[in-house]
UniProtKB/Swiss-Prot annotation:
Belongs to the LpxH family. It is found in: Cell inner membrane. GO terms for cellular component: cytoplasm; extrinsic component of plasma membrane. The gene is lpxH. Its EC number is 3.6.1.54. It is a peripheral membrane protein. Binds 2 Mn(2+) ions per subunit in a binuclear metal center. It catalyses: UDP-2-N,3-O-bis[(3R)-3-hydroxytetradecanoyl]-alpha-D-glucosamine + H2O = 2-N,3-O-bis[(3R)-3-hydroxytetradecanoyl]-alpha-D-glucosaminyl 1-phosphate + UMP + 2 H(+). Hydrolyzes the pyrophosphate bond of UDP-2,3-diacylglucosamine to yield 2,3-diacylglucosamine 1-phosphate (lipid X) and UMP by catalyzing the attack of water at the alpha-P atom. Involved in the biosynthesis of lipid A, a phosphorylated glycolipid that anchors the lipopolysaccharide to the outer membrane of the cell. This is UDP-2,3-diacylglucosamine hydrolase. It is an enzyme of class 3 (hydrolase). Mn(2+) 1 binds at residues 8, 10, 41, 196.
Amino acid sequence: MRTLFIGDLHLSADRLDITQAFTRFLDTELDDADALYILGDLFEVWVGDDIALPFALELAEKLKQVSQKLPVYFIHGNRDFMLGKQYARAAGMQILPEVTCLNLYGIETVILHGDSLCTLDKAYQRFRKLRSLSLARWLYGCLSKKTRQGIADKIRSNSKSSNQQKSYTIMDVEPNAVDALFAKTHTKHMIHGHTHRPAIHQLANGCQRIVVGDWYEQGSVLSVSAEGINLQSLPFEQTT
């Protein structure tokens, strides 16, 4: 048996090919899985459970079917932080805290989306702090659907423009932030996404940091079992 980790699918109505590949993955790759963890940014943008698009509602039905066979866990990302209990319930997903520790076959591991580790991106971290406030989230939820969609589109556009101007270092995790989280959680193994730079990092202090990749051009899946770990790319044509 094995536990699977994915993230950064960025599903949208503009890229239904990714949704189709993910659906095939759910149909074909979970037979021997103990659990599925989705580490954020399942969707490209999420402005509220009351504005879920048809493709997202269909996906919820598929995930609900999966959840009847194995647990499906979800951690919010920077794109879908407004995904709420209503959609999670419809999809059979259990929402986890943004930093969660779990025992993976005897190994204490911390999992998260990963955006909180990119501390050199000061502008984004200010936005992240603001959006985490309960009052800010409540006020946003009170806006009309049209206004929320407009704000989300603006943030998405600004994010793409801003990211093109940021350096590689700023867009990646900051080593001190990684070390601090290891110390805080008393773990030596970490799994996250967000940076879209899949890799297994063996750190000098004996810790291990694994990054799952995005699903823009191919799938990225981390499989963890008692025998070890396997971070693999999954070409979309292999899911047919």
